[in-house]
């Protein structure tokens, strides 16, 4: 028979990891279920060397460092972690929830969903022959291996701008965006404009020039024009964002707003006892940042504790007094 947990956290990214740690501070029996093969979510898998700018008090913190610190924080507690396990159904029983996964079943008194944007994969570059080129990349695992190489980046959001600024320190860097304006933090855009990065706007990639295995040049075409330019490069990085899939979320009987779980001020969903935090939840004024999700975690945990035992105060002691 499955053990009965106080709190089951669905998602092992930064927000889920911190929620598990905080749940232990409330002496809850907690476990984590994640469909990915490793903890840490997108920062660990896609951005291990990218600086995370919205965690207060930790300048120059990378995705890998953030993940390692959160795991280290959790290591002092007994936390069953189920990786490569996808949640299929969450069913309300008399006094608990039955969670059916791709590998089995779990019983829990409450659920905190911290699955971010769900399963994710990069939005691909759609040009003829793109699949065969080995020097077209969608994420960076070791930035130093590109030192001194000619790097071109496609995209206009935070990731594209941040990576351009990071690569500029070690390599000749070109950034190509189809619009004149960038969709990134104002401070980052200003830093980009003051940097040595070669900025090509408004241009879009139009042709790959190489031998089918190694890309040597990229042809770009000015938007609403026939004007073309050719960029010599050693590596091409595509930062067009990600396609996310919430998978079975729509089958869990929760009220949604555009594939996000609607929550109240307790971080509670339309089903009492099920909470949502981080990028997977929605409320008026919601901002999708790691810092926001980290703040939502204690709210969900404390209200879950109160749901389990109404005599437990929602407002706990401060950690400094524990």
From Swiss-Prot:
It catalyses: 2 reduced [2Fe-2S]-[ferredoxin] + NADP(+) + H(+) = 2 oxidized [2Fe-2S]-[ferredoxin] + NADPH. Its cofactor is FAD. Pfam families: Pyr_redox_2. FAD binds at residues 34, 42, 47, 87, 120, 279, 320. InterPro entries: FAD/NAD-bd_sf (IPR036188), FAD/NAD-binding_dom (IPR023753), Fd--NADP_Rdtase_type_2 (IPR022890), Ferredoxin-NADP_redctase_2 (IPR050097). Keywords: FAD, Flavoprotein, NADP, Oxidoreductase. The keyword Oxidoreductase applies. Belongs to the ferredoxin--NADP reductase type 2 family. Homodimer. HAMAP family: FENR2 (MF_01685). PANTHER family: THIOREDOXIN REDUCTASE 1-RELATED-RELATED. This is Ferredoxin--NADP reductase. The lineage of its organism: Bacteria, Bacillati, Bacillota, Bacilli, Lactobacillales.
């Amino acid at each position: 028979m499955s053990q009965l947990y106080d709190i089951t956290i669905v998602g092992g990214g930064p927000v889920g990891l911190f929620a598990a740690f905080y749940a232990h501070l409330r002496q809850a029996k907690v476990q984590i279920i994640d469909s990915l093969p490793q903890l840490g979510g997108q920062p660990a898998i896609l951005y291990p060397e990218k600086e995370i700018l919205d965690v207060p008090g930790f300048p120059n913190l990378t995705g890998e460092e953030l993940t390692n610190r959160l795991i280290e924080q959790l290591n002092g507690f007994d936390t069953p972690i189920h990786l490569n396990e996808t949640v299929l159904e969450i069913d309300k029983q008399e006094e608990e929830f039955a969670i059916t996964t791709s590998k089995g079943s779990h019983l829990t008194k409450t659920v905190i969903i911290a699955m971010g944007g769900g399963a994710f994969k990069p939005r691909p570059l759609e040009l003829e022959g793109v699949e065969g080129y080995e020097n077209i990349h969608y994420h960076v695992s070791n930035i130093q291996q590109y030192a001194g190489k000619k790097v071109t980046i496609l995209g206009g959001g935070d990731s594209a701008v941040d990576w351009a600024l990071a690569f500029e320190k070690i390599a000749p860097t070109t950034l190509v965006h189809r619009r004149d304006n960038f969709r990134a933090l104002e401070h980052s855009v200003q830093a980009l404009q003051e940097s040595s990065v070669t900025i090509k706007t408004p241009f879009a990639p139009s042709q790959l020039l190489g031998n089918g295995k190694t890309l040597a040049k990229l042809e770009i075409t000015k938007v609403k024009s026939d004007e073309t330019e050719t960029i010599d490069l050693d590596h091409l990085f595509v930062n067009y964002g990600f396609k996310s899939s919430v998978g079975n979320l729509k089958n869990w009987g929760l009220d949604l707003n555009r594939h996000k779980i609607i929550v109240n001020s307790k971080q509670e969903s339309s089903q009492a006892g099920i909470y949502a935090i981080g990028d997977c939840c929605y409320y008026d004024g919601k901002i999708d940042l790691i810092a926001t999700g980290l703040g939502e975690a204690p709210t969900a945990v404390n209200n879950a504790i109160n749901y389990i035992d109404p005599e437990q105060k929602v407002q706990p002691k401060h950690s400094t007094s524990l």
